[in-house]
Design a protein with these regions (language model features):
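Short, well-structured N-terminal submotif of metal-dependent ribonuclease cores
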Residues: 1-52, 61-78, 137, 141
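Active-site neighborhoods of divalent-metal-dependent phosphate/nucleic-acid chemistry enzymes
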Residues: 2-13, 58-64, 82-130, 134
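Structural detector of well-ordered beta-strand residues that form the stable sheet scaffold
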Residues: 47-49, 89, 132, 147
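Residues at the C-termini of beta-strands that transition into short coil/loop
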Residues: 50-52, 92, 135, 150
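Acidic-residue sensor for enzyme active/binding pockets
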Residues: 55
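Short, hinge-like loop/turn segments at secondary-structure boundaries
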Residues: 64-69, 106-107, 148-152
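Flexible glycine-rich beta->alpha loop in the catalytic core of nucleotide-sugar glycosyltransferases
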Residues: 130, 137, 152
């Protein structure tokens, strides 16, 4: 698994959580496989790509106001403060370069380019991180190390 010195932090393994993992944890009844998998990971290794924060906040922002939105917002806020605790892997120059190279390669191959997943891949590549996602096929051609916590 990936080890990293420097940003996003120290010399340790870095695990980035994709949007679908966070969404599964925000539900009334979080996916038990994801919870069990996450419980086996050192919390200090859990990071969130800044793009995932965007996706989650945007998704909540376009929801109709009501109790479901409030509950999901509270769930996200709890996860951000308790699980992630400020460990946000940002889109910096290196990760933007890696994402741009990947997007150009995909376009040249005629492969559809999903900008958000490409930015997440760039962050993962620049961080030499393991990406926890249900959508492994979105990242396989990028050379990103992935794990599917829904299957563990």
């Amino acid at each position: 698994m990936a080890q990293r010195r420097g940003k996003p932090g120290g010399f340790r393994r870095v695990i980035l959580l994709d949007t679908n993992v966070m969404s599964a944890l925000m539900q009334n009844e979080p996916d038990r496989h994801v919870v069990l998998w996450l419980d086996r990971q050192p919390v200090s290794e859990i990071w969130l790509p800044s793009v995932v924060v965007f996706e989650l906040r945007y998704g909540l922002g376009i929801m109709h106001e009501g109790s479901r939105r409030e509950r999901l917002e509270q769930g996200l806020n709890n996860l951000l403060s308790q699980l992630v605790s400020g460990r946000i892997a940002t889109l910096d120059g290196r990760s933007a370069q890696r994402a741009a190279q990947l997007a150009a390669k995909r376009k040249a191959q005629g492969t559809p380019v999903d900008l958000r997943d490409t930015l997440i891949a760039g962050i993962a590549l620049a961080s030499e991180a393991l990406l926890a996602t249900r959508n492994q096929r979105h990242f396989m051609d990028a050379g990103v190390a992935v794990v599917n916590p829904f299957e563990h």
